[in-house]
């Protein structure tokens, strides 16, 4: 059913200035709760499985899960009742594996891209007291093995022969793994069965369902404090940490969401599932859509053809990350950059639409038909709400998105450890560059960060700390990291530095030397620097990145003699390509200005990153050679000989900005 675009102001423009509940400690809450208790319960719902079960009882014949086998094919749908049949068959089938009933670990790995089988397997686990452990490729092979061993995964559901082969190849180093359930055809399974031998049993998902149907059992979910998911972080600080998410956490975040969006999102809505289900954000979104009884259509599995999925599904709610919205923005401006008239027309149309949007009026206009219709068609033409998370979104991109889609764009902030939003802008927030007020399920305060000389009460800046039922209790089998995450008063320390800007929360930094890229991936620069410093060409290196860029960059202080030798062995294509003559004795400044020297060092970084099996997003894509070494005297090194990152970032701010502006250096 089509949900018409409103031609008047949306009805969820709540006051969004945080309410200061405790002035002495600086504790702020949502203006929706003020002095009332936090919103963390739902009437008639105790656990996540209740959400699904209640919707099945309320609207059994309504469509729930959709998919299409080819890009040109229309979506096919399973009803809530049909999905429930498969969920109970799946859960009953999983209980036929004795490892899940006799061993202490009740964890099941899900190693797949978003698909109906992923959601059915997850619900099947929750219905029968099993714990879901998502796995994903960007973790890297070593991290994958660590998770499988720490969670003692005896059963893993995976979606492709390639992923199944990865597991089989590593089976000797993952002794708990006994069964792989595959979401592909039986014909593709035979070669893998031969490779697995007797070590690992392999069956198809349909065979699992058949076993469950033959041995159907009554659902037996865990209680409110029962563990439902262990979501591992991407391991940027070393070994991945498993966030323990229980029923109580997810119910609290859904309760808070219902308080904010309950009058706007309905059972008539449709969402495209393409952001990774291995991350908590997409799981949270789909649980809430399940709560209201809406539809979830899965993408075809290829991120490059998501636009085809969108056109065919025609979703009403679009979940995104800033990088994708920036790509839309860049593509539009790239297409019109050669035409002065088109640039003028677009700017004028955006100005006119923004006048309407600023008044919270989201109706179709002349400019939609004339200018924005082609963009809207790429998204199916029905989007009426855009939800963005993962990294900050630039204000021009935010205004552009609001105008083009002619709908509210809500920018949220949260992390795995908070199971979803900590705060969010609302439809009436027009300025951007902030993430709104606290979610109704949490309290927020800023605390001092001594290492950064930040005093929250003095600077209106400090570490963002969160407290509420939606916050996890700790990391799986990791009491040391848990103690660092949650203090004695129950405050969860996010590691992000924030400030209250015009009444709204703004994320401005990281407490530790970790940063997030535009696509939402975290980077630990010291990990990269440790590898790159193995090069004889490098004396010192400083790796940096920010949330508006998709790649890290670096400042490099070169080793003079090895780099001179490399230059002398280099044969430029033309005498003028290198500004350093091989026979001369150039200064370090001359070497750093030489484009050939830069190419040589970049090639070295590429070689080292490949040897270390860096992920694509971890590889430095642009560098600047600098002649002044980092030292204690110039404040670029700490007394313990560590790089003073804030000082280096401040000293080379202009150079770093230029590295992001330049195209990544070809490698």
Walk through the language-model features, giving the residues of each.
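Structural core segment of the AMP-binding/adenylate-forming
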Residues: 2-20, 127-210, 600-602
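Conserved pre-ATP/AMP-binding loop-to-beta segment of ANL
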Residues: 63, 182, 202-203, 210-232, ...
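Conserved AMP-binding/adenylate-forming
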Residues: 72-80, 91-139
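Conserved AMP-binding A3 loop
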Residues: 77-81, 228-254
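Conserved structural elements of the adenylate-forming
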Residues: 84, 88-89, 210, 243-264, ...
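Conserved ATP-dependent adenylate/AMP-binding module captured primarily in the ANL superfamily
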Residues: 139-170, 253-272, 286, 302-317
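Gly/Ser/Thr-rich phosphate-binding loop
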Residues: 200-203, 316-319, 328-430, 443
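Conserved ATP-binding/catalytic segment of the ANL
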Residues: 452-517
């Amino acid at each position: 059913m089509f949900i018409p675009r409103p031609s008047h102001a949306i009805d969820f423009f709540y006051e969004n200035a945080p309410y200061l509940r405790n002035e002495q400690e600086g504790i702020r809450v949502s203006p929706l709760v003020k002095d009332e208790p936090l919103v963390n319960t739902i009437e008639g719902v105790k656990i996540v499985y209740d959400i699904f079960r209640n919707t099945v009882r309320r609207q059994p014949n309504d469509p729930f899960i959709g998919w299409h086998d080819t890009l040109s094919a229309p979506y096919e749908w399973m009803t809530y009742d049909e999905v429930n049949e498969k969920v109970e068959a799946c859960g009953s089938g999983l209980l036929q594996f004795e490892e899940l009933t006799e061993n202490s670990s009740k964890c099941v790995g899900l190693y797949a891209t978003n698909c109906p089988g992923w959601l059915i397997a997850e619900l099947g686990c929750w219905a029968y007291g099993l714990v879901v452990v998502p796995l994903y490729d960007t973790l890297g092979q070593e991290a994958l093995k660590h998770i499988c061993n720490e969670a003692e995964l005896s059963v893993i559901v995976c979606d492709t022969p390639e992923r199944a082969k990865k597991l089989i190849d590593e089976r000797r180093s993952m002794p708990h793994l006994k069964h792989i359930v595959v979401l592909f055809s039986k014909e593709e399974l035979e070669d893998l069965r031969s490779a697995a031998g007797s070590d690992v049993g392999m069956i198809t998902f349909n065979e699992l369902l058949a076993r469950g149907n033959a041995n159907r059992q009554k659902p037996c979910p865990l209680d409110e404090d029962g563990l439902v998911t262990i979501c591992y972080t991407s391991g940027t600080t070393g070994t991945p940490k498993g966030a323990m998410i229980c029923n109580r956490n997810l119910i609290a975040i859904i309760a808070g969401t219902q308080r904010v969006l309950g009058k706007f999102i309905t059972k008539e809505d449709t969402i495209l599932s393409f952001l990774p289900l291995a991350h908590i954000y997409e799981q949270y979104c789909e649980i809430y859509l399940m709560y209201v009884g809406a539809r979830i259509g899965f993408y075809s599995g290829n991120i490059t053809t998501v636009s085809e999925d969108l056109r065919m599904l025609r979703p009403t709610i679009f979940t995104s990350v800033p990088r994708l919205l920036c790509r839309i923005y860049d593509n539009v401006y790239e297409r019109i950059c050669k035409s002065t008239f088109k640039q003028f027309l677009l700017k004028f149309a955006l100005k006119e639409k923004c006048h309407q949007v600023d008044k919270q009026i989201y109706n179709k206009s002349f400019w939609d038909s004339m200018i924005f219709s082609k963009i809207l068609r790429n998204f199916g033409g029905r989007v009426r709400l855009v939800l963005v998370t993962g990294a900050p979104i630039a204000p021009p991109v935010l205004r552009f998105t609001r105008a083009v889609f002619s709908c509210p764009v809500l920018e949220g902030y949260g992390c795995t450890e908070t199971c979803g939003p900590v705060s969010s802008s609302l439809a009436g927030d027009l300025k951007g560059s902030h993430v709104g007020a606290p979610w109704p399920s949490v309290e927020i305060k800023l605390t001092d960060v001594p290492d950064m000389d930040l005093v929250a009460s003095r600077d209106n800046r400090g570490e963002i700390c969160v407290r509420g039922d939606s916050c996890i209790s700790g990391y799986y089998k990791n009491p040391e990291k848990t103690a660092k995450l949650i203090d004695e008063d129950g405050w969860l320390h996010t590691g992000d530095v924030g400030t209250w800007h015009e009444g709204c929360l703004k994320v401005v930094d990281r407490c530790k030397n970790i940063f997030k890229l535009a696509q939402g991936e975290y980077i630990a620069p010291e990990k990269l620097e440790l590898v790159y410093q193995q090069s004889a060409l490098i004396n010192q290196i400083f790796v940096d990145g920010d949330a508006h860029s998709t790649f890290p960059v670096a400042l490099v202080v070169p080793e003079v003699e090895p780099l001179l030798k490399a230059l002398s062995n280099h044969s430029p294509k033309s005498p003028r390509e290198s500004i350093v003559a091989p026979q001369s004795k150039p200064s370090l400044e001359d070497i750093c200005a030489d484009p050939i020297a830069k190419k040589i060092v970049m090639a070295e970084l590429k070689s080292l990153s490949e040897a270390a099996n860096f992920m694509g997003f971890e590889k430095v894509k642009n560098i600047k050679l600098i002649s002044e070494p980092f030292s204690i005297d110039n404040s670029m090194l700490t007394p313990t000989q560590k790089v003073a990152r804030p000082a280096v970032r401040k000293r080379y701010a202009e150079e770093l900005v230029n590295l992001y502006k330049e195209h990544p250096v070809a490698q």
